[in-house]
Amino acid sequence: MSRVRRLLLGYLFPALLLHGLGEGSALLHPDSRSHPRSLEKSAWRAFKESQCHHMLKHLHNGARITVQMPPTIEGHWVSTGCEVRSGPEFMTRSYRFYNNNTFKAYQFYYGSNRCTNPTYTLIIRGKIRLRQASWIIRGGTEADYQLHGVQVICHTEAVAEQLSRLVNRTCPGFLAPGGPWVQDVAYDLWQEESNHECTKAVNFAMHELQLIRVEKQYPHHSLDHLVEELFLGDIHTDATQRVFYRPSSYQPPLQNAKNHNHACIACRIIFRSDEHHPPILPPKADLTIGLHGEWVSQRCEVRPEVLFLTRHFIFHDNNNTWEGHYYHYSDPVCKHPTFTIYARGRYSRGVLSSKVMGGTEFVFKVNHMKVTPMDAATASLLNVFSGNECGAEGSWQVGIQQDVTHTNGCVALGIKLPHTEYEIFKMEQDTRGRYLLFNGQRPSDGSSPDRPEKRATSYQMPLVQCASSSPRAEELLEDSQGHLYGRAAGRTAGSLLLPAFVSLWTLPHWRILR
């Protein structure tokens, strides 16, 4: 396989698939002409322009976010809610970084998806040193860290007994004589001055400190209210690989306890907590998943292997079809587009997950896809492929959309049609009462969740609902001439739908980028 071909397979395809579902960008501007019978659809387009498109346009215009380079991480940073790691693991985090470069981190673990019943807490101490700007992830900073100690404290007798058995089985002879562990007593899992270590019993790794990004923003354009967010490196989706994995994306951000969203109740609870008083978040009922309406990204999203994108998904619950628009960029603030993907297909009825509390399982199929190169480099790469591997041979031009369904996808992007993926979703509401939609995190090894056993057990960054219902795809396609990224975009509304499906299938190919 040629070097150019490998580059295509490793860069373009992963970027497309890793990103998720999403409908149009604010950059899609429907043509002012209307169909004779399109009064209702014209009203819909006007609403969409003022909602979904406006929200994405806000992101593409910078969203009043500034990135600190190099980042200042001194301070107290806390989770904004109950987080889900692969496994699944339900947790909250409380990290303190001091001016002498030392840190103390709490990782609170729970037995349910609402973080209401703490099971055990890890207390991690160490030292961190910021290095240079990351050459892997633009906008990030690389760091080195050194652990001084890791302790665990159990919050119930049952968990103490269970965890001590697990440690003894994982590291024979590790436990001192005297019986199992007891509740509310801190035990060492690792000490700097000794070789006595058994952190693998709890799948512990702190490599998230190897990649750091700090963002500052003023919500609602209020200069009186600063919110600071700390993004730390992502965690491998296979718990056994965590200690070997170097981050290439981010976890959900922590907020600065001093400069946080004032509506964040969880922030205040976690801020006041410690290993003897773990945070107990307010109980909430799980929302029933209804895949309908339109959903867009809330920020410029980062995927492993240097992929930046925004997503726009459209779900039609009347016939269980979906559309996704994926807008890919070369920069971490999503200002310089590289290519877009529009995908559509069908999805199954949801079934409550027996493995991930609060999750609902779906099966997604994609059978139609369009691609639009948005810069000369991407168009050139696509033109390298010959025959029926990715659209019409040698015909790719910047800003011109092509349907790749007839070539069964696009080899250059690692996409083969038709394709099936096994997904998991959950729905929540934010502090403003808006609905958020989370879909499954892509496997860190770049594979595709194309079998039930490969279904995700954790989630990507959420999309926010921007419209509660949507017209049928056929109506959009026949009556819209949207332009992505201004004049340089595709000619049909189909280009808006593409990113949603791409988001589902891009992650496997992201791995190829590595």
UniProtKB/Swiss-Prot annotation:
Recorded superkingdom: Eukaryota
Record flagged with keyword Heme: no
Keywords: Cell membrane, Glycoprotein, Membrane, Signal, Transmembrane, Transmembrane helix, Wnt signaling pathway
Region named Disordered: 437-459
Summary of subunit composition and partner proteins: Homodimer. Interacts with LRP5 and WNT3A.
Gene that this sequence comes from: Apcdd1
Family: Belongs to the APCDD1 family.
Post-translational modification: N-Glycosylated.
Function: Negative regulator of the Wnt signaling pathway. Inhibits Wnt signaling in a cell-autonomous manner and functions upstream of beta-catenin. May act via its interaction with Wnt and LRP proteins.
GO cellular component: plasma membrane
Residues in the Extracellular compartment per record: 27-492
One GO MF term attached to the UniProt entry: Wnt-protein binding
Name the UniProt record assigns to this protein: Protein APCDD1
Localisation per UniProt entry: Cell membrane
Organism: Mus musculus (Mouse)
The keyword Glycoprotein appears for this protein: yes
Inducing or repressing factors: APCDD1 is transcriptionally regulated by the CTNNB1/TF7L2 complex.
A Pfam family hit: APCDDC
Topological domain ranges for the Cytoplasmic compartment: 514
Positions of glycan attachment: 100, 168, 319
Transmembrane segments: 493-513
GO biological process, one term: negative regulation of Wnt signaling pathway
